[in-house]
Amino acid sequence: MAEDGMLLNFSLDDSVIKPQQRFKGGTWKDRLVAKKIAVKRQNKSRHSAETGAVNSNNPQNPNKINVPTGQRPAKRQRIDGGDFKPTTKSSAGGGGVGNDEQTDRKSYGDRQVISSLFTYNPTAKTVASTDGATHDEDTTEPAKPSNAPLVDGIDTFTSLGLSPSLATHLLTKLNLKTPTAIQKSSITQLLKEECDAFVQAQTGSGKTLAYLLPIVERLMRISSHNKGKKDSEGNTVHRDSGLFAIVLAPTRELCKQISVVLDGLLRCAHWIVAGTVIGGEKKKSEKARLRKGLNILVATPGRLADHLENTKVLDVSNVRWLVLDEGDRLMDLGFEEEIQGIIKKLDERRRPSKIPDLPAKRTTILCSATLKMNVQRLGEISLKEAIHIKADPADEDDEQKDGSKQPEFSAPAQLKQSYAVVAAKLRLVTLTALLKRTFARKGSVMKAIIFVSCADSVDFHFEVFTRRESSEELPDADDENAPSSSNVHGSIATASAFSNPSNNVILHKLHGSLPQHVRTATLSAFAKQKDASVLICTDVAARGLDLPNVDFVIEYDPAFCSDDHLHRIGRTARLGRDGRALIFLLPGNEEGYVDILKGSYREGSSNSVTRNEVNEILKRGFGGNSEAISKGWEDKATDWQLDIERWALEDSTILEMARRAYQSHIRAYATHIAAERHMFNIKDLHLGHLAKSFALRDRPAKINVPGLRPGNEDTKKSFKADRKLASGEKRKMSAREDSSSTTDAAEARKKMQQKLKEHMAGASEFNIA
């Protein structure tokens, strides 16, 4: 047949005989995902073949354009290498908030992000007034002081009922000529009647002397009446006569200050002995002082409750005066249970005294600047049929007539308050510029206090402001402006960031995490400092402390409640002196805090709260007075910020300190009271911009601190890696994880060796020191 010699030649494509790819191993979900990816890749290559597109990776690509080397397009600036100054918002094409948000959402891995100080900052909601003055301009008439001593010359300490010897001592030794309004009301009432009292007055009005003078006067009278009696009868007042008065204060610093004031008063009555028992001190030394005998005891509630429970030599049977100073702070710190126990033990151990003229009942005095619910609760616990003592009794009558409720606590009338709306990225440079301008001239400002929210922030800013550049020379040993010898504690140093050749500024730091002897030495050094000095601290220094010559208070972080704000600014403008206070606020909801600032003055007062412009502060701090000098203030501020960031990157200790300060600041920001949380909402914080103010270049998710939980991103990565490890795949560890695991292993090995040494030592098992 003709068909027998026919030969058919079929041309088959390679894809027909290509073996199918099969996926093995892993979970069914992983195999399904891999299969979908392979199918998608095949469909894409088939579509490219049909449309005639050529792969760009092919060296024979006809669509390839060769660009000459001299006309290469401009490359984007690198993010991870070197410092650069980004273009400003006005010069960047198409820049806006939307672009900024997209940039922030980009993943740069472990690379550093260097952002500009003056771009993409939120604008303030409120409009600044055209007649606003800066903090160093005196444009308003000084108000009449509301907490100054009386100047009419009629009321003197002698006319209030004090003995001539005590009044003369106040005049000659303490330089106190006339009493304040609260001292006049309190001394007269407490000497006239033996009843409980609630003393309420402005901060800085002399409440300490208002309750100490009546107690010292009564003890001096009892001593003079029994002067001819023999000591063996126990009727003469001396250190062995017993404990007559107890003063409770919330903080150790306030106890130390009350003790200093009391020692100054008792120089005219040396036979009356006072002492202190506070936390942080050696209990053995305190027991020795109690064993020798004390007549007046200043204590913190926790330590006094401990001594009442465990110290048998502490005899409180003759206690006739109990003072609760800063009652609102005592309740805020949670001392209600201790105070209840102290009052209960005083009632149980009270005995009739053999000393004539000693009151038969105990008088309790509660002192507080505010009349909040917790203070009323403390009054219910400690006071019985108490009288209310105010600086001006007419205020209470006017309030009853008008039916209007005045603020519970008002700022001194002569205090000038101001605020500055500062973007988060500009906080650090603005504070530096403000301090540079404040201490530009010697003698303009003697002392200033900076309040921050947490102890880690205090440590970080102290290191920033006291860092010494390589070009700077160390101060001479005989230099009068050099830091004192207490600098061995690391809490006092020269503020190189805002000092100048004509005005050397000494910086002090104070917070509750420091050892007690360091806190005491630092506070004493700041109080005795005669040159320009700055104290950066937490709220541990916001209550009751009378620090002399404080002219300026800066609230770098707003207080957690309005009452704490009033106590902070009360460190200045004391006893009729002038003072200024400035608070930093973020743009947005925090600007509503200005209404609280305005409401801190008494109704009808002519005082106003002024606004300081950020650009003006930066221009005056990094520029100068003249227009020609102050042109490059933006570049100077940027250079200073970048220098701080490089310094933090080079020193791992400083970098960890900055990260801890950043984390602690965010945690502290979330603790504002509920009534003010709409102004201080943590969800409104721009964490990336806030990290810039702590000299950090890491993204917020990458700012990890040892001992804290990892961020969401790291948690997800570790979860996925563990899941792959469970499925049989080999986990690839990053450099960070490798280093951390190595560190953990080294620490574990070190702890194991330490435990072995302890077990090898025979006496360690019975070491009870």
From Swiss-Prot:
Position of sequence motif Q motif: 155-184
Compartments (UniProt record): Nucleus, Nucleolus
Sequence ranges assigned to domain Helicase C-terminal in this UniProt record: 430-622
Pfam families per UniProt: CTE_SPB4, DEAD, Helicase_C
UniProt keyword list: ATP-binding, Helicase, Hydrolase, Nucleotide-binding, Nucleus, Ribosome biogenesis, RNA-binding, rRNA processing
Entries under Gene3D superfamilies matching the protein: P-loop containing nucleotide triphosphate hydrolases
GO biological process: rRNA processing
Biased amino acid composition, Acidic residues: 472-481
Motif (DEAD box): 325-328
Composition-biased stretches (Low complexity): 55-68
Record remark: domains: The Q motif is unique to and characteristic of the DEAD box family of RNA helicases and controls ATP binding and hydrolysis.
Protein family membership: Belongs to the DEAD box helicase family. DDX31/DBP7 subfamily.
Name recorded for this polypeptide: ATP-dependent RNA helicase DBP7
Record organism: Coccidioides immitis (strain RS) (Valley fever fungus)
